[in-house]
């Protein structure tokens, strides 16, 4: 299952502030050729800014360059994240799932 919008944005503070919504949703971090992490948050913008501040160094070590997102309410965003993770198999979601036993 593909993202609802194929548009990717550069992962930097200016781009996040300009494009990422403050609303609830799912987001994905990727490099040019691989998916690194797909998450969900009550604020897509806040979550992305936390990555840029180094809050999740195990994700940043893979050097994500772009982000994507979908605005969704809480229950839908959790289900959508699971679908996207299953489809894309992001590197850091596999590490998180295997080390914590949760998704």
Model-predicted regions and their roles:
Residues 1-46, 50, 70-86, 103:
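GIY-YIG nuclease catalytic motif and its immediate N-terminal context
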Residues 52-56:
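Short, glycine/polar-rich helix-capping loops at beta-to-alpha or helix-loop-helix junctions
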Residues 58-74:
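Basic nucleic-acid-binding interfaces
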Residues 89-91:
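Acidic, metal/cofactor-coordinating or nucleic-acid-engaging core segments within structured domains
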């Amino acid at each position: 299952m593909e993202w609802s919008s194929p548009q990717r944005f550069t992962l930097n503070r200016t781009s996040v502030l300009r494009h990422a919504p403050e609303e609830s949703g799912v987001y994905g971090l990727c490099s040019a050729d691989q998916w690194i992490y797909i998450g969900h948050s009550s604020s897509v913008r806040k979550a992305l800014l936390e990555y840029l501040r180094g809050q999740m160094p195990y994700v940043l070590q893979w050097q994500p360059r772009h982000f994507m997102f979908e605005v969704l309410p809480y229950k839908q965003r959790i289900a959508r994240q699971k679908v996207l993770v299953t489809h894309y198999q992001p590197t850091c979601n596999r590490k998180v799932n295997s080390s914590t036993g949760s998704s």
